[in-house]
Amino acid sequence: MYIYSMAREQTLSALQLVYSSTELQKLGFSYYQISNLVEQNKLVRLNKSHYENVEFVGDMNDFYYIPAFVPEGVICLMSAAVYYNLTTFRPDSIDVAVPLKKKLSSFPQSVNISLHYFSKERLSLGVCDVKVQKNSFKIFDIEKTVVDIISNRNKVGIEETKEILTNYLARQDRDINKLYRYAEKLSCLKILKTYLEVLL
């Protein structure tokens, strides 16, 4: 009875949008109590292992849903470029990099996700863990994002690629050497140099 009472006193943080079943259990919620929170419309079940906190009051960002639906996913390409303010383009879905041959069983109805299959090396380079209040997601760092876009310039669009690289080069914190290192590892150093010769 004492353990049950202690668990009932646990509350959800209004600053965390998505909870995993494991997180809820660590907070002291039983499966029965989690079901009650769903019935009370305090939680919405997203999939077998994650729930959305209806009482979330933080700044909304659809990136917070990605770990629930694509645990190994990394925000990439145009979605990452938007995050770093490198483009005025607004994609209608979130670009997420995943391992080759990765299969996913469920997607959210409210969030559009575009999967991009990356090799093991490309997926492991330049990954950042971003934490905002009690929410987190993975995204490639800004230089890796630029190099990935150059590699995928035909898919992204030549004008969009030029805009993104131009905006990156205008930043005071730009790191050309880091661009070169990524480009060399990902076999697009020649095309990067061609762009830089024109833009610098």
Residue locations for each model-derived region?
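Short amphipathic alpha-helical interface segments
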Residues: 4-19
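Conserved functional hotspots at enzyme active or ligand-binding sites that engage polyanionic ligands
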Residues: 2-4, 71
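A short, conserved structural fragment
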Residues: 42-48
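Nucleic-acid-binding surface
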Residues: 16-23, 38, 52-200
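Short amphipathic alpha-helical interaction segments
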Residues: 26-39
